[in-house]
């Protein structure tokens, strides 16, 4: 187990950690996932092994394998119950940083489109009328890269999903016509040289502390691989 956890916030009840890219949240079914976030959490805090479902070790929510960023860990059963309720009631605010192909015509917008399982490709999600309600807000932070004729090749976005459907941000941005850079599963034309994964990072989370009732805000800076790629484009 070579990966280690970067702890962004910690007290007796809850912790916020930085999920590295390439690591899945926890084992799913009988598939071997290698080292998971649940493994790393159990190694760092052995006492949380009994918090929440057995395979999650206190992990309150998940990020896609190749998405990096902040995730919450409940260190007690009381905290796990309270935090999962906040997610279910959409009281947790999450902000992502995404680099997308091209530049959206509307600099600040909202995508309201149902998301469900792809009929032909079961491991992927898609927008379709039989899906579950999903809503994502975005705002252009800057445009970078050269697409020729004075146009920008990419747009850097702040993204706020108000619902938490599987692959929601990736699906919604692809449906907008601006897939996440490097996300070939959802429409990116190709993975650019220097970008080893999809450019999507969970940059910030705000939640109410399950015991004190105070609002907690935790930020996770852009990791080195994405920061280096962005620097090359600027």
Q: Which positions does each model-derived feature cover?
A:
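RNA pseudouridine synthases
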Residues: 1-234
